């Protein structure tokens, strides 16, 4: 099955502590989760590793968020939208369900 949300898509968070925020998807994980830039930040206590040159301390990083808690953002309507698939010129393309425009 083709992915409805892909890397570099702009999404809006529907649920959780970051509800209503917009950001780009930086990574799609095979478990059905996404890593979104600046969303779902957690504080990780990092141990120093001098062999790798990693300094210790408390590091803020992005944790995965469930794909069902985000929706793709349609810049034409300014709202969250759903995605459909159709064939154009022999290629499978994604389109927004609200206005039938192609997802860029």
UniProtKB/Swiss-Prot annotation:
Q: Which keywords does UniProt give here?
A: Ribonucleoprotein, Ribosomal protein, RNA-binding, rRNA-binding
Keyword Ribonucleoprotein assigned: yes
Residue ranges that the Swiss-Prot or TrEMBL entry lists as coiled coil: none
- Quaternary assembly: Part of the 50S ribosomal subunit.
List the taxonomic lineage.
Answer: Bacteria, Pseudomonadati, Pseudomonadota, Gammaproteobacteria, Alteromonadales
Task: Report the GO terms under cellular component.
Answer: ribonucleoprotein complex; ribosome
Q: Spell out the PANTHER family in the cross-references.
A: MITOCHONDRIAL RIBOSOMAL PROTEIN L24 (PTHR12903)
Q: Which GO terms describe its biological process?
A: translation
Q: What is this protein called?
A: Large ribosomal subunit protein uL24
User: Which InterPro entries has this protein been placed in?
Assistant: KOW (IPR005824), Rib_uL2_dom2 (IPR014722), Ribosomal_uL24 (IPR003256), Ribosomal_uL24_CS (IPR005825), Ribosomal_uL24_KOW (IPR041988), Translation_prot_SH3-like_sf (IPR008991)
SMART domains from the xrefs? KOW
Molecular functions (GO terms): rRNA binding; structural constituent of ribosome
Q: What does this protein do, in the record's words?
A: One of two assembly initiator proteins, it binds directly to the 5'-end of the 23S rRNA, where it nucleates assembly of the 50S subunit.
Q: Which family does it belong to?
A: Belongs to the universal ribosomal protein uL24 family.
């Amino acid at each position: 099955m083709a992915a409805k949300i892909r890397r570099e898509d702009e999404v809006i968070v529907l649920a959780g502590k970051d509800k209503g925020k917009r950001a780009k998807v930086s990574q799609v994980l095979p478990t059905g989760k996404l890593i979104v830039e600046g969303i779902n930040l957690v504080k990780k206590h990092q141990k120093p590793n001098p062999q790798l040159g990693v300094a210790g301390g408390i590091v803020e990083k992005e944790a995965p968020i469930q794909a069902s808690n985000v929706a793709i953002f349609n810049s034409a309507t300014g709202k969250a939208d759903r995605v459909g698939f159709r064939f154009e010129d022999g290629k499978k393309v994604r389109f927004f369900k609200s206005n039938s425009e192609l997802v860029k």
